[in-house]
Regions:
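P-loop potassium selectivity filter motif centered on the GYG triad
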Residues: 19, 28, 90-154, 217-249
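Single conserved hydrophobic/aromatic residue that forms the stacking wall/gate
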Residues: 1-7, 11
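Cytoplasmic-side transmembrane-helix entry/capping segments in multi-pass membrane proteins
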Residues: 71-82
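Hydrophobic alpha-helical transmembrane segments of multipass membrane transporters and ion channels
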Residues: 23, 27, 82, 86-90, ...
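Central hydrophobic cores of alpha-helical transmembrane segments in multi-pass inner-membrane proteins
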Residues: 28-30, 49-65, 83-90
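Alpha-helical transmembrane segments
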Residues: 46-52, 144-165, 208, 247-249
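Juxtamembrane interface elements at the cytosolic ends of transmembrane helices
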Residues: 57-66, 158-193, 205, 222-229
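Short, hydrophobic transmembrane alpha-helix segments
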Residues: 32-45, 64-69
Length: 249
């Protein structure tokens, strides 16, 4: 029937967008991989495997479902839900596969806390993670960066992140935006959703860069300045120190 065919098209379009998001998260893992490489960290294989898993899942699905059509509001709500779950799953892979957090449930918790900017952490519990006797400070730099980066992309909302890439996929982002920001506000922004997303991201990146510069000039090591800017800008709260910002007082 035409209704069943329409639903299949919507599922196809949703899978296309989710696959694109998974692929972008996978590509972004190149940054902590390079950090780990230049710091001669022993766990680079875990990052590479994480990238391979994300891209091997996302690229075939994206290619198969490439023909895009118009999404409904119902699809938008479903996408919001699955976007958080998929990005949190992808984000947990470097924690788990580098054995920084050897329990997958704990890795999932840490990742979900990051992308939702909740700020709760499993790290520091020596009973659960006896391999991290010094808590957060036991983590390698690549993982410290990845924790911070997850909060940073979560800070603007996964949906705004999606809106930014939707024009590349030929799909409108209004349904996703309405699912994240319901009511008259979404309707007002509706005609300029693409431009709004661009401006918000530019402001977000700009403030992050300014904060990094100020922290660095104030004496904080540049790597830690970047990580703290990535976590304070979205009000997430992750830190590279057990005592958080108090460690610098």
């Amino acid at each position: 029937s035409s209704h069943r065919r329409q639903r299949q098209m919507c599922i196809r379009d949703s899978l296309n967008i989710l696959a694109a998001m998974l692929g972008i998260v996978g590509i972004s893992m190149l940054i902590p991989t390079l950090i780990a490489y230049f710091n001669s960290e022993p766990n680079i294989r875990g990052y590479v495997l994480s990238i391979v898993i994300c891209l091997s899942l996302s690229i075939p699905i994206w290619l198969i479902t490439r023909k895009s059509r118009k999404l409904t509001s119902k699809d938008g709500f479903a996408l919001v839900t699955f976007a958080w779950l998929i990005v949190a799953f992808a984000g947990s892979l470097p924690f788990y596969l580098t054995e920084s957090i050897p329990n997958f449930t704990d890795a999932w918790f840490e990742s979900m806390s990051g992308v939702t900017t909740t700020g709760a952490t499993i790290i520091g519990n020596t009973q659960t993670l006896p391999n991290l006797l010094n808590g957060i400070e036991s983590l390698p730099k690549g993982i410290l960066f990845w924790r911070s980066f997850l909060q940073w992309i979560g800070g603007m909302g996964i949906i705004l992140f999606t809106i930014a890439i939707l024009p590349l996929l030929g799909v409108g982002g209004v349904q996703l935006f309405k699912a994240e920001v319901p009511g008259p506000v979404a309707d007002k922004i509706r005609p300029r959703v693409k431009e709004t997303a661009k401006v918000l991201w530019l402001v977000y990146i700009g403030f992050t860069a300014i904060q990094t510069l100020l922290l660095g000039l104030a004496g904080m090591p540049w790597f830690e300045a970047v990580c703290h800017s990535f976590t304070t800008m979205p009000t997430g709260g992750f830190s590279t120190q057990n005592e958080s910002i108090a460690a610098y007082s």
